[in-house]
Amino acid sequence: MGLGSRLDACLAREVAGGDRPIAAVLAALAEAAAGTGRLLRDGGADAGPDDLDAAVQARFVAALRETPTALLALPEAEAPLALMPDGAIAVALTPLDGRENLAGNQPAGTLFSLRPAAGAPFREPGRIQVAAGFVTYGPRTELAVTWGAGARIFTLDPSGAFRLSREAVAIPPTSTLYAIDAANARFWEAPMRAFVEDCLRGSEGPRGQDFAMGWCASLAVGAQRALCRGGVHILPGETRRGRANGATRLIHEAAPIALVMEAAGGAATDGRDARILDLPTLDLQQRTPLVFGSAEEVACVGKYHDGRRHTGARSPLFGQRGLLRA
């Protein structure tokens, strides 16, 4: 399909036969995302946080009820919501990611994952996903998605239709961009400190080039940036209590991002040597460290964790310094 093609036309042509339930669910998610984009654009973000979350979630749930979705896993729910008893698809959904950004007129997003409903779909590793993607609500509402035929980006047009704006998206293998929440530096493990410190040293450090750092408190927005510009987005495990495995939900967030990244030639790991799509799932609310983006940059982070790049003692960029101590 050529640029400008409607999402529904692409689905009708490429997702046929026994895969029609996938097409129906993706079309419903796109419809709900289009409505969410209009809601946020027209002032819906001014509603109270709880009201906005409820409105967006209700929009997606209503759309999925009309599709062959058997189970719907939502971020705060202890158990999946049963929708259609004989449905073929199980969906994991984060309806509104990065809601806090909206108060400052910054982008937010939605993440989704489709799995076969047979058996125990949310007890299986992410590699069983049949489709996944994320939506970003910013100057444009864009849908990044894969259903097994590479990664594509569709842009919402004024009529309310998603149209193909980028096909066969390919993440550059290397980049000088990295994203990490530096406010949590004191909780990072030593290899992560070493990686960031070497990036901060730029051309004078061991990596021999200057880097740019950015951070946006939305996984969907970070994934969109990595998809379009490359680089590495890092949500590490931390030393503080309860954060050894990070804060990213494996089923709702890490798995769909990983499927899209790999479809575009990128990578997604736990920061060490474990591919996100291979991680065993033990719990619906399971968390994982997450590193994704350009394949070579993701691998570089792993080298610091396995000792191939981490050299132990470092200069005190992240030391205990301040006005009252050296």
From Swiss-Prot:
Catalysed conversion reaction: beta-D-fructose 1,6-bisphosphate + H2O = beta-D-fructose 6-phosphate + phosphate
Alphabetical keyword list: Carbohydrate metabolism, Cytoplasm, Hydrolase
GO biological process entries: fructose 1,6-bisphosphate metabolic process; fructose 6-phosphate metabolic process; fructose metabolic process; gluconeogenesis; sucrose biosynthetic process
Cellular compartment(s): Cytoplasm
Identification of the protein by name: Fructose-1,6-bisphosphatase class 1
Top-level taxonomic group: Bacteria
The keyword GTP-binding appears for this protein: no
Subunit structure: Homotetramer.
EC number: 3.1.3.11
Enzyme type, top EC level: hydrolase
Origin species: Methylobacterium sp. (strain 4-46)
Pathway given in the UniProt record: Carbohydrate biosynthesis; gluconeogenesis
SUPFAM superfamilies: Carbohydrate phosphatase
